[in-house]
Regions:
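ATP/NTP phosphate-donor binding region
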Residues: 1-79, 301
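Solvent-exposed alpha-helices and their adjacent loops that cap or buttress functional pockets
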Residues: 16-17, 73-75, 96, 131-137, ...
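Short glycine/serine/threonine-rich phosphate/pyrophosphate-binding segments
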Residues: 33-36, 87-94, 112-116, 241
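A short, small-residue-rich loop immediately preceding and capping a beta-strand
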Residues: 72-110
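A glycine/threonine-rich phosphate-anchoring loop and its flanking beta-alpha core
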Residues: 98-190
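Active-site segments that bind and position negatively charged phosphate/pyrophosphate groups
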Residues: 180-291
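C-terminal charged capping/lid subdomain of soluble metabolic enzymes
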Residues: 281-349
Length: 349
């Protein structure tokens, strides 16, 4: 992916978006309140003609995409800017894809790799997963200002750690038994950096970020969450991008409290433990579980406000039909998943 990261990253915008371009800015409200002091220095100047500057909404759904499509004069824009978290960015990417207008991203949290990928994860109006939209192109450029990200609520970095570790576990699982082409083999190798450096850096990164300290651990973790994960997503065969960690997340969204009360990467990280248990990857499970315990990522159903003895069939039904399980080394059934969930309930690392 094309990206610039650093304390003056936003000053690089002029190198990529010609002066006097017509632009539209769409943002998440809370994110923009923090980011505006940085973005205004470059975007709200005589260099650019701003045709729209508005909140995108609150979720990645087609109602919010349509709001962008209906902005007066939007078709004459030279560039769309998405300033916010993954749902804001996915919404703007989806709109840009329909309009054939280049999208530039300014992530305000390090929670997913949405700022650099060429997919948009769309939900229905109830917040239940709907579909993954394959876009024609990724964002033209991503501008990562670490001072914005380190001042965001710490829960987003925490969830991003969970989402990022899943990439390595899922891609190696999905690609197992296949003869890989060069780019997929390279992408899966890069994916190791979504896991091992995170194991090493995560605890210190969270401690430092709580104090707004831009340590090496914080910067490496931000880069691995946004850029390394995005690299894997962009260059491997799309069928290798996910597996049970994400499929179970999408299944869990049938319970409305999951989308309302839990973050994407937080829930995905639980799915990673379930996948490792199902696949009998006990050494990796032990390492991952230990980090979850250390930093408070979920390790059991109760951490997601679910009970061991409740009926999970609605979740499991939605999980097994998810597209992320179309290309896996063996058939993943409801029974296999439930068995792994119950084993995880009894597991103690």
């Amino acid at each position: 992916p094309d990206f610039t990261m650093g304390e003056n990253a936003l000053l690089e915008i002029e190198k990529f978006v010609p002066k006097h371009s017509k632009i539209a800015i769409f943002y998440g409200q809370k994110a923009y309140d923090e980011a505006k002091q940085y973005t205004d220095k470059i975007l709200n100047t005589e260099n650019y003609e701003i045709l729209a500057e508005q909140c995108y909404g609150k979720d990645a759904n087609y109602a919010n995409v349509n709001k962008i499509l209906q902005v007066k004069g939007i078709q004459s824009c030279d560039a769309l800017f998405a300033i916010g978290g993954g749902k804001c960015i996915d919404t703007v990417k989806c709109a840009g894809n329909i309009l054939n207008i280049p999208v530039y991203t300014v992530p305000t949290i390090a929670s997913t790799c949405a700022a650099v990928t060429k997919i948009s994860i769309m939900y229905d109006l109830n917040g239940t997963f709907l579909e993954i939209v394959q876009l024609k192109n990724p964002p033209v450029h991503c501008f990562i200002e670490p001072n914005i990200i380190v001042r965001a609520p710490i829960k987003y970095l925490w969830a991003g750690i969970g989402d990022t570790m899943a990439k390595h576990i899922e891609s190696t699982f999905s690609a197992r038994n296949d003869e890989l082409n060069f780019t997929s083999e390279l992408g899966i190798k890069i994916g190791e950096n979504c896991y091992y450096p995170i194991l090493r850096d995560a605890k210190k990164a969270l401690e430092d970020a709580k104090e707004y300290k831009l340590s090496q651990e914080v910067e490496r973790t931000i880069q691995n969450i946004i850029v390394t994960t995005g690299c894997v997503s962009l260059i491997v065969n799309p069928e290798y991008n996910s597996a049970l960690s994400h499929a179970l997340f999408y299944g869990l969204t049938v319970r409305q409290h999951i989308e309302k009360g839990h973050l994407h990467g937080e829930v995905v990280s639980y799915g990673t433990l379930v996948q490792l248990m199902m696949d009998n990857q006990m050494e990796l499970l032990k390492k991952t579980y230990r980090l979850h315990e250390e930093i408070g990522l979920p390790i059991c159903l109760a951490d997601l406000e679910l009970r061991r003895n409740e009926d999970l069939s609605d979740i499991l039904e939605k999980t097994v039909i998810n597209q992320e399980l179309r290309h896996v080394p063996y058939k993943v059934t409801e029974e296999l998943i439930l068995n792994a969930i119950m084993k995880l309930e009894d597991y103690r690392g």
